[in-house]
């Protein structure tokens, strides 16, 4: 047993560690064989602690510090034998509690934290009941003094900045961790508590979004340009993979468009290659004709192919007679399977769908008629004395060809010929010198090309000259300088020439007949037209806004 003198000495040592002390007697009376009662009382004491911080830039802060000294009187009841030893250990920790009245405080040093520990031979630990009793007493005492709360909050919020080290020391006296352990003793949870220290939240860096490259028009054109021939071939009846209906299928099953590669046929329920019968293609053509836009409503768009049932059957019969890839490629354009590049669709329309296929199948090597639609009738050519205008134009054209390349005399002659070509009546004379002008266009300087293109621009306005300008040689020479490195004036002239050619096709004029073309010529024209379409897409990203606008307008017209 420990008497009251030992307990007083232990409490005295603890009080010496405090600056202003935590005072209060703690009396423990223990009777050996009788009942002992421990009565705990808590007294609230409020002290104002003002400390000064030495050094430059002293910072001040207002804090309310409340010390509650717990006076513990331990009462134990022991109903065991006299020989049993009792050990009582009472550990009292001073805990800072917020006070009603506000007293300014200047901090300089860390305020000491005192503990009063009374250790006896008993192993009884301090349970949470003592702390709960102190809290309940404090809450009941707060309800009686609610009137002073607003002033306390308003004054307490006034504070100055302190250093990080002092802030951490002060915070460690009032709470542990992130949640305050003081405020909940003095006010309900729904009320706003005093400002407490909370560590700054960690900023989580958001992952950078992955850049998805957008396909430019040029990249789409590259994917579009990888064309291949789709040949319609008969399938032998003995094969097990033959579709249930029809005996004609497509060997190639994928087509490439600006939007990517898409499957053309359906996957059959049986093993074998993919098939699309001509009956299905015919059905698709009927649907496009029924639900598609009216081709006569807008002349700026390319006309769609419309096949009558008789024409479709005739086309299929003609395809059975040949396996020529070029003829089958034209058939896929007509059926809407393959894309038709600029002017190719117009040429097919102009000649006639079945007429072109029939002529290519029956007479693949027919020679082009020596005459041209741009020439006048034989009466004008057989006249004994040519007109004065014709002779003069002949003289000018011969002078241009005979002059040195890019010479001032040649440039002057080309400029004069551009003015003479305004009249359509003399165009048949100029068109006879087109091969010589193409040489100047391919080898001449920028100025020479400019004046030659001016002459071609005037010729393209005449419906009778379109047949000569659409030839493979002319298209090849016009497409060659059609790039970003060419001068702006020359690019605009080439665009104007193709706009005029496109306009002549859209007027439904009969520019081609089955006697006026050969298979080799059509192949060359289609190849040059395809190359022109690709370069046209490249120029859609030209740096000059005027060129870019003209190119986009031409694309929409085609």
Curated annotation (Swiss-Prot):
Keywords: Repeat. Signal peptide: none annotated. The keyword Repeat applies. Residues 1-14, 139-156 have a biased composition (Basic and acidic residues). Pfam families: Arm_2. ARM repeats lie at residues 300-339, 422-461, 463-503, 520-558. SUPFAM superfamilies: ARM repeat. It comes from the Eukaryota. Residues 1-35, 139-165, 369-388 are annotated as: Disordered. InterPro entries: ARM-like (IPR011989), ARM-rpt_dom (IPR006911), ARM-type_fold (IPR016024). The keyword Magnesium does not apply. Belongs to the eutherian X-chromosome-specific Armcx family. This is Armadillo repeat-containing X-linked protein 5.
């Amino acid at each position: 047993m420990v008497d009251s003198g030992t307990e007083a000495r232990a409490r005295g040592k603890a009080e010496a560690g405090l600056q202003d002390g935590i005072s209060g007697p703690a009396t423990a009376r223990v009777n050996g064989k009788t009942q002992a009662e421990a009565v705990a009382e808590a007294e609230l004491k409020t002290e104002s602690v003002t400390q000064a911080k030495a050094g430059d830039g002293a910072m001040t802060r207002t804090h309310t510090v409340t010390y509650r000294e717990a006076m513990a009187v331990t009462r134990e009841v022991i109903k065991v034998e006299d020989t049993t030893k009792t050990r009582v250990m009472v550990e009292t920790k001073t805990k800072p509690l917020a006070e009603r009245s506000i007293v300014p405080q200047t901090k300089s040093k860390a305020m000491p934290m005192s503990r009063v520990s009374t250790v006896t031979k008993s192993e009884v630990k301090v349970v949470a009941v003592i702390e709960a009793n102190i809290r309940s007493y404090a809450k009941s005492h707060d309800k009686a003094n609610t009137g002073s709360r607003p002033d306390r909050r308003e004054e307490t919020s006034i504070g100055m900045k302190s250093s990080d080290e002092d802030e951490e020391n002060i915070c460690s006296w009032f709470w542990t961790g992130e949640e305050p352990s003081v405020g909940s003793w003095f006010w309900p949870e729904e009320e706003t508590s005093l400002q407490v220290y909370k560590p700054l939240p960690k900023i989580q860096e958001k992952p950078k979004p992955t850049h998805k490259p957008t396909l430019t028009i040029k990249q789409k054109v590259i994917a579009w340009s990888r064309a291949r021939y789709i040949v319609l071939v008969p399938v032998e009846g003995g094969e097990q993979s033959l579709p249930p209906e029809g005996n004609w299928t497509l060997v190639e099953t994928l087509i490439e468009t600006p939007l990517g590669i898409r499957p053309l046929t359906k996957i059959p329920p049986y093993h074998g290659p993919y098939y699309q019968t001509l009956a299905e293609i015919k059905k698709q053509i009927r649907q496009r004709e029924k639900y598609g836009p009216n081709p006569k409503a807008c002349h700026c768009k390319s006309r769609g192919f419309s096949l009558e049932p008789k024409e479709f059957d005739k086309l299929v019969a003609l395809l059975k007679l040949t396996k020529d890839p070029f003829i089958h490629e034209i058939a896929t354009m007509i059926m809407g399977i393959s894309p038709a590049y600029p002017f190719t669709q117009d040429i097919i329309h102009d000649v006639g769908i079945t007429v072109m296929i029939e002529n290519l199948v029956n007479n693949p090597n027919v020679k082009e008629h020596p005459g041209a639609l741009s020439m006048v009738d034989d009466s004008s050519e057989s006249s004994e004395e040519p007109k004065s205008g014709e002779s003069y134009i002949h003289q000018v054209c011969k002078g241009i060809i005979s002059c040195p390349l890019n010479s001032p005399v040649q440039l002057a002659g080309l400029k004069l010929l551009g003015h003479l070509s305004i009249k359509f009546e003399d165009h048949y004379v100029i068109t006879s010198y087109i091969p010589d002008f193409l040489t100047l266009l391919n080898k001449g300087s920028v100025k020479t090309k400019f004046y030659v293109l001016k002459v071609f621009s005037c010729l393209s306005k005449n419906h009778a000259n379109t047949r000569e300008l659409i030839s493979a040689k002319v298209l090849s020479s016009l497409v060659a300088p059609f790039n970003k490195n060419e001068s702006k004036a020359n690019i605009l002239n080439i665009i104007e020439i193709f706009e005029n050619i496109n306009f002549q096709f859209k007027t439904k004029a009969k520019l081609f007949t089955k006697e006026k073309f050969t298979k080799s010529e059509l192949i060359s024209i289609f190849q040059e037209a395809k190359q022109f379409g690709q370069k046209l897409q490249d120029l859609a990203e030209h740096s000059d806004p005027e060129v870019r606008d003209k190119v986009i307008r031409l694309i929409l017209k085609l």
